[in-house]
Swiss-Prot record:
Its EC number is 3.6.5.-. The modification Diphthamide is found at H699. Residues 17-346 form the tr-type G domain. It comes from Candida albicans (strain WO-1) (Yeast). This is Elongation factor 2. It is found in: Cytoplasm. Catalyzes the GTP-dependent ribosomal translocation step during translation elongation. During this step, the ribosome changes from the pre-translocational (PRE) to the post-translocational (POST) state as the newly formed A-site-bound peptidyl-tRNA and P-site-bound deacylated tRNA move to the P and E sites, respectively. Catalyzes the coordinated movement of the two tRNA molecules, the mRNA and conformational changes in the ribosome. Has antigenic properties. Gene3D superfamilies: 3.30.230.10, 3.30.70.240, Elongation Factor G (Translational Gtpase), domain 3, P-loop containing nucleotide triphosphate hydrolases, Translation factors. The keyword Nuclease does not apply. The lineage of its organism: Eukaryota, Fungi, Dikarya, Ascomycota, Saccharomycotina. GO terms for molecular function: GTP binding; GTPase activity; ribosome binding; translation elongation factor activity. The gene is EFT2.
Length: 842
């Protein structure tokens, strides 16, 4: 146990080479929080008696009840290394005490925006994988997110006790399971890896994979055992590590190493990993769980484990826990792996600077980030808001990338839409206090240098969810985070008692602050809408809203899915609209954009802020666009970054650039509320073919052009086979064989289509993957559990948009019925308008 004073931590913060910022990421229920507990216990923040069941990181009541992590929380740990260990660190270090900032993030798919926020402020990730279940859909998603942020992973294979106690595997089987898991992690890493990072695949023989049991509180790496044996046999430790994994065998008769699994007489030899590492563990388990009273003391003496007075009377699982914790304490193995193999901020910011900073990569601010310089101008990124213990206020939670942040310092608070030299989305305020985040509590601290994670008090009124804090007006923003999920399920919320309305409005503001991936807005008909990523996410948001943020009883409508409007063909004729004063005309055609281009826009590969030549290059080389068109993209819409484009195909039009702003504004408006039923548009490209403008500037102002452009966009879309797209979930279900029939029947009932079904080798479990329209997903979990007797556990994650087949104008078709219902609910005429409503004759 380490007794912390704030001064000691503050001292460690200055040695940035000895800081490690890391997050724990994994699939739901693979045991992140339990592992984090054993780390926290080592750093001396909770008492040893409670670890394992304390779930210290789960700070919220509902997290402890549901047994899942919802928000990500941060904690500082202290690790001290022996001089021998420090020698093995491949980067610059200073002394042998280390500060580890640990962020535990949720594994449940619906909360993956929380994971993104946690990843942005860290440099390394501890990826937890369940021995029995292996790599699942969410493991892959979070690992992909981490590699996209240029974060270096190390792996923990958790729940080894399950394999030993539940499945009773043999040593060789267990080795094969481990090897398979490591392999599948490396496949994902090599697929998504950024060349700048170099090879970040994980290898047990290099010490970047640990094997653990979070519940029992023990863990080991190959390196630890190599340490023990190299001292015992006087062999070189590095050589020993290589031999303790893979196909190497020790022949006890000849005392020689070999890579063949049989000796000279053809007798099978035992793999070194099994013989030297698994054997002592298996023996302990066998002796203790079979209550062999006489064997236990002999084994303990051999392994140099001493039991205290009352521990000698324990037996069974309780004794097993105590012994394994003494033999292989989890925190030692994990902290050693974190300190040895994860980068310090100094190392990481050299290659992460360009992905973090929006401005030019050679300006002084990017250079300061690259050098992690505590004396430069302040660059701090706030990744999310954390509610304080007194209701209604938030800590801004973020990381200092350059400079030093102090209490009472005057700073510039730049929201996500801020641009250098402009005034919007910018506040000049001073920071009231800087605090250290410690899980459930916070500690006040005077200042915090570059490379560390910090909480700020007093700026929550000026930031919505995330933003950049600097002290220099020339500094650009840090790049906005990319969320891998989008809010597609929405409900309308109203108060039961009309007097409570102001509280609801205030509560909605707070809710959207505290969760990075929730959308709250007011619809045209005056309803308050809350949109989330899935059923569970929405349920928790609404529960938060009712109990904490608004604190008033609410009425909640049944959930509705958001759709997208699109076109499937090119406009059948050129659409034309005239301005209200009849002096200006715009001629356009609409056509669909390929799904791949839309995805690239949504994932930020094709970016509206990029240089137009670079953007044209990608479009021409990767997607086969005409270069001239690709250079003349006027804007992306809606919100300036959506997957719809205006392309200027006009030839020699006078005054054209004067109306560009009006056209862009109109297009944003038209794509935000499409012609079919007022939803966002997606994958629509509008080509401006010709424009006739009045010679007098006064007759072609915004008031003339904007409505015209909006009408002509609508007309061209209605002429181009309009259709709607619905969101589709990717479902992953793990279940035993006898439950598969039930799964198929539920999926068929809900328009689902199965894409793969495979058995996990070495287990009786099957993994079924399927596409399920979000529209049909409500109550899916419940029905699935009924049909399979509670054996199937689904994971839903938003995957893609898919066009609904059928005519939108025919109310008897499936999409037509959806359109009609939505139009009636929004108070529009039930029929989809004809194109003639927006089309003007010459």
């Amino acid at each position: 146990m380490v007794a912390f004073t704030i001064e000691q931590i503050r001292g460690l913060m200055d040695k940035v080479t000895n800081v490690r910022n890391m997050s724990v990421i994994a699939h739901v229920d693979h045991g992140k929080s339990t592992l984090s507990d054993s780390l926290v216990q080592k750093a001396g923040i909770i008492s040893a008696a409670k670890a394992g069941d304390a779930r210290f990181m789960d700070t919220r009541k509902d997290e402890q009840e549901r047994g899942i992590t919802i928000k990500s929380t941060a904690i500082s740990l202290y690790a001290s290394m022996t001089d021998e260990d420090v020698k093995d660190i491949k980067q610059k270090t200073d002394g042998n005490s280390f500060l580890v900032n640990l962020i535990d993030s949720p594994g449940h798919v619906d909360f993956s925006s929380e994971v993104t926020a946690a990843l942005r402020v860290t440099d390394g990730a501890l990826v937890v994988v369940d021995t029995v279940e292996g790599v699942c859909v969410q493991t892959e998603t979070v690992l992909r997110q981490a590699l996209g942020e240029r974060i270096k992973p190390v792996v923990v294979i958790n729940k080894v006790d399950r394999a030993l106690l539940e499945l009773q595997t043999t040593k060789e089987d267990l080795y094969q399971t481990f090897a398979r898991t490591v392999e599948s992690v490396n496949v994902i890493i090599s697929t998504y890896c950024d060349p700048v990072l170099g090879d970040v695949q994980v290898y047990p023989q290099k010490g970047t994979v640990a094997f653990a049991s979070g519940l029992h509180g023990w863990a080991f790496t190959v390196r630890q055992f190599a340490n023990k044996y190299s001292k015992k046999f006087g062999v070189d430790k590095e050589k020993m590590m290589e031999r303790l994994w893979g196909d190497s065998y020790f022949n006890p008769k000849t005392k020689k190493w070999t890579n063949k699994d049989k000796d000279a007489d053809g007798k099978p030899l035992e793999r070194a990993f099994n013989m030297f590492i698994l054997d002592p563990i298996f023996r302990l388990f066998a002796a203790i769980m079979n209550f062999k009273k006489d064997e236990i003391p002999v084994l303990l003496e051999k392994l140099e484990i001493q039991l205290k007075g009352d521990e000698k009377d324990l037996e069974g699982k309780a004794l097993l826990k105590v012994v394994m914790r003494k033999f292989l304490p989890a925190a030692d193995a994990l902290l050693e792996m974190i300190v040895l193999h994860l980068p310090s901020p100094v190392t990481a910011q050299t290659y992460r600077a360009e992905t973090l900073y929006e401005g030019p990569s050679d300006d002084p601010f990017c250079t300061a980030i690259r050098n992690c310089d505590p004396n430069a101008d302040l660059m701090l990124y706030v990744s999310k808001m954390v509610p304080t213990s007194d209701k209604g206020r938030f800590y801004a939670f973020g990381r200092v990338f350059a400079g030093t942040v102090k209490s009472g310092q005057k700073v510039r608070i730049q929201g996500p839409n801020y641009q250098v030299g402009k005034k919007e989305d910018l506040f000049l305020k001073s920071i009231q206090r800087t605090v250290l985040m410690m899980g459930r509590s916070v500690e006040q601290i005077d200042d915090c240098p570059a490379g560390n994670i910090i909480g700020l008090v007093g700026i929550d009124q000026f930031l919505l969810k995330s933003g950049t804090i600097t002290t220099n007006e020339a500094a650009h923003n840090m790049k906005v985070m990319k969320f891998s999920v989008s809010p597609v399920v929405q409900v309308a919320v109203e108060v039961k008692n009309a007097n409570d309305l102001p509280k609801l409005v205030e509560g909605l503001k707070r809710l959207s602050k505290s969760d990075p991936c929730v959308l709250t807005y007011m619809s045209e008909s005056g309803e308050h809408i809350v949109a989330g990523t899935g059923e569970l996410h929405l349920e928790i948001c609404l529960q938060d809203l009712e109990n904490d943020h608004a604190g008033v009883p609410l009425r909640i409508s049944p959930p509705v899915v958001s759709y997208r409007e699109t076109v499937e063909g090119e406009s059948s004729m050129v659409a034309l609209s005239k301005s209200p004063n009849k002096h200006n005309r715009i001629y356009v055609k609409a056509q669909p954009i390929d799904e791949e281009v839309s995805l690239d826009i949504e994932n930020g590969v094709i970016n509206p802020r990029d240089d137009f030549k670079a953007r044209a290059r990608i479009l021409a080389d990767k997607h086969g666009w005409d270069v001239v068109d690709a250079r003349k993209i006027w804007c992306f819409g809606p919100d300036g970054n959506g997957p719809n484009l205006v392309v200027d195909q006009t030839k020699a039009v006078q005054y054209l650039n004067e109306i560009k702003d009006s056209v862009v504004a109109a297009f944003q408006w038209a794509t935000k509320e499409g012609p079919i039923f007022g939803e966002n548009c997606r994958s629509v490209r509008v080509n401006i073919l010709d424009v006739t403008l009045h010679a007098d500037a006064i007759h072609r102002g915004g008031g003339q052009i904007i409505p015209t452009m909006r009408r002509v966009t609508y007309a061209s879309m209605l002429l181009a086979e309009p259709a709607i797209q619905e969101p589709v979930f990717l479902v992953e279900i793990q279940c035993p064989e006898n439950a598969i029939g039930g799964i198929y029947s539920v999926l068929n009932k809900k328009r689902g289509q199965v894409i793969s079904e495979e058995q996990r080798p070495g287990t009786p479990l099957f993994t079924v993957k399927a596409y399920l329209p979000v529209n049909e997903s409500f109550g899916f979990t419940g029905e699935l559990r009924q049909a399979t007797g509670g054996q199937a556990f689904p994971q839903l994650i938003f995957d893609h948009w898919q066009v609904m087949s059928g005519d939108v104008t025919d109310e008897n078709s499936k999409p037509g019925a959806i359109v009609k219902e939505k139009r009636v609910r929004a108070g529009l005429k039930p029929e989809v308008p004809e194109y003639t409503e927006y089309y003007d004759k010459l």
